[in-house]
Amino acid sequence: MTNAGIDLQLGFETALQNLGLGAGAAHALWMPLPMLLLIIAATLGVMVMTWLERKISAAAQQRIGPNMAGPQGVLIPIADGIKLLTKEDVLPILADPVLFTLGPILVFLPVFLCYLVVPFGQNLLISNIAIGVFFLIAISSVQPIGLLMSGYGSNNKYSLLGGLRAAAQSISYELPLALSVLAVVLMSNGLDTVGIVEQQSGLGILSWNVWRQPIGFVIFLISALAETERIPFDLPEAEEELVAGYQTEYSGMKFALFYLGSYANLLLASLIAAVLYLGGWSFVVPVETIAALAGIPLDNPFLQIGAAALGIVMTMVKAFIFIFLAILLRWTLPRVRIDQLLDLGWKFLLPVSFVNLLLTAALKLAFPTFFGG
């Protein structure tokens, strides 16, 4: 089922205007809602991910894991949140107060802004803009600035080294990640995230980009792991070398921003992978085929509501496959050295991503039916 997607902002403001409100008042009422929705959804997602992290790590190490705070330890994320909220927010004497405060904000904010253009389900996204993929890449590139500010503003040698490592790592892996995404954009003939999902919905699982972009898919996964600073790419906060890297001097809510931003970034990368390569909300079997077999017309409202609800579930299931893989890799792989990390990004992934992009362009010209000509 390929619909163009609904702009929630336009629908919300139009409904309020139909009730008699002016355009300015309707827009003013809309403005805080997306950020509120993002904060609530991301917080819930982070809570689930932190619980999964503890349980999967416990299973990998043959432990029980959290089991005291609620059944199976499901309330442990709430306990973590209360602990961070009640901790003192310390500002080191020799730290730069402006940079020290702005750093966590610039790390935290771009991640949440990127959620504005990620479609969570059929016709469910906050802003359906035509340059959604470009917006994702552009906004996410702001994050290294916050990492550098945090490291430099802390006036700590470990923080500075961690900030420099984080910026170098982020810049090194942004390029292959962007080139792998560009290959998908080339096949989809547009930067619209909804359009990319619709381009994969024709034949169900056979239409997913993962089959036409296996090299780009692997490059995206490796680069996304490096961008989210997960083991084996957690060089910026290597405990044995740098205490906690650029986070060393942080506590309380400022540290909570790093903590929340890290897991929200992993969830974002997983959602983008699901949208770009696994068909987003698309089912394994197309909805049209299911409706035809069941004898249900496509314009049936119950079918549309059910497909939309299941589409949200499909998107989250695909995203959590990547999250499970990232958590499992954290507890099974050793950390790479900084020279190995940079060599992998610049000497291997970047050239391969260039070749993959050129190969995609050639295949699109040779086989336009299969590669979006």
UniProtKB/Swiss-Prot annotation:
Keywords from the named record: Membrane, NAD, NADP, Plastoquinone, Quinone, Thylakoid, Translocase, Transmembrane, Transmembrane helix
Transmembrane segment boundaries: 29-49, 98-118, 129-149, 177-197, 202-222, 267-287, 309-329, 348-368
Membrane topology: Multi-pass membrane protein
Keyword set includes NAD: yes
Family matches, as Pfam families: NADHdh (PF00146)
Subcellular localization: Cellular thylakoid membrane
NADP is among the record's keywords: yes
Any one of the GO CC terms: plasma membrane-derived thylakoid membrane
PANTHER family: NADH DEHYDROGENASE SUBUNIT 1, NADH-UBIQUINONE OXIDOREDUCTASE CHAIN 1
Subunit annotation: NDH-1 is composed of at least 11 different subunits.
Protein family (similarity comment): Belongs to the complex I subunit 1 family.
NCBIfam families cross-referenced by the UniProt entry: PRK06076.1-2, PRK06076.1-5
Name under which the protein is recorded: NAD(P)H-quinone oxidoreductase subunit 1
Gene: ndhA
